[in-house]
């Protein structure tokens, strides 16, 4: 249903526009679907054209797909401009995309660090800056992503953990600096059954039980109904008095004090 037809219905994101990076698959796709169901327009940013086009066709006129390499700094401004051109304004920035390689710390190379920071931390940083003036006009929201790998120091995850904790740090700085502009900045640390996790489980028999052994709920989250619904809350007016926080959406795997 088009966003314009949702006026008067009980939806939480009516007339809001969001950018979701890595939005064509996994958690990003789950967030996109959850946002659309709540009335939002979404610019899906990805490099998987087949998946991006399919999602846009599935969800209709509330979604536009943009092929863009977020590891190129100059693309941040064009991504924001594309969202504003398509839907007239920007309310929510979801920095979900990230790529990395696993290795023990002593085997982690500079190239591995570069990959993680160039696809995770730096695009988050660039897009936040590019989106700021538009978000400030709309009392907007930024939703960034952390990981238990960084919070808990997971072995073989040095490059990913480092970039994710850098994202948490810059999110807290932005939360302090941008509150005066009406922008809230929060972080989700998820555990979800994505395509990548499914492939990892299939390639490593018995690993699923070990992965969930420290999770009280003993299951992976669903990208849409578990992670996406929390993102809807953070993007909605219901979370307008909340900023600088990390939401652990991981079935109780990590309970921060």
Label each PLM-derived region with a short phrase.
Residues 87, 125-128, 134, 220-249, ...:
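C-terminal substrate-recognition "lid" of short-chain dehydrogenase/reductases
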Residues 94, 179, 184, 242-244:
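Short, small/polar-rich loop/turn modules that mediate ligand/substrate recognition or access, typified
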């Amino acid at each position: 249903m088009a966003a314009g037809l949702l006026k008067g219905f009980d939806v939480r994101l009516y007339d809001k526009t969001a950018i979701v990076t890595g939005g064509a698959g996994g958690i990003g796709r789950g967030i996109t679907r959850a946002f659309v169901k709540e009335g939002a327009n979404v610019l899906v940013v990805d490099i998987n054209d087949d998946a991006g086009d399919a999602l846009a066709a599935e969800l209709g006129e509330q979604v536009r797909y943009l092929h863009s390499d977020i590891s190129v700094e100059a693309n941040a401004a064009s991504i924001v401009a594309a969202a504003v051109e398509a839907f007239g304004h920007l309310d929510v920035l979801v920095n979900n995309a990230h790529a990395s390689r696993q290795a023990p710390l002593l085997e982690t190379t500079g190239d591995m660090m570069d990959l993680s920071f160039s696809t995770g931390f730096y695009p988050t940083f660039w897009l936040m800056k590019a989106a700021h003036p538009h978000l400030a006009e709309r009392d907007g929201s930024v939703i960034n992503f952390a990981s238990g790998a960084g919070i808990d120091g997971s072995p073989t995850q040095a490059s990913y953990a480092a970039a994710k904790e850098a994202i948490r740090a810059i999110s807290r700085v932005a939360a302090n600096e941008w509150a005066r502009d009406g922008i809230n900045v929060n972080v989700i640390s998820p555990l979800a059954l994505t395509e990548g996790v499914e492939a990892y489980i299939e390639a490593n028999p018995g690993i699923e039980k070990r992965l969930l052994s420290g999770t009280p709920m003993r299951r992976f989250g669903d990208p849409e109904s578990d992670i996406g619904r929390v993102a809807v809350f953070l993007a909605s007016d219901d979370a307008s008095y909340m900023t600088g926080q990390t939401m652990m959406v991981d079935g109780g795997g990590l309970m921060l004090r």
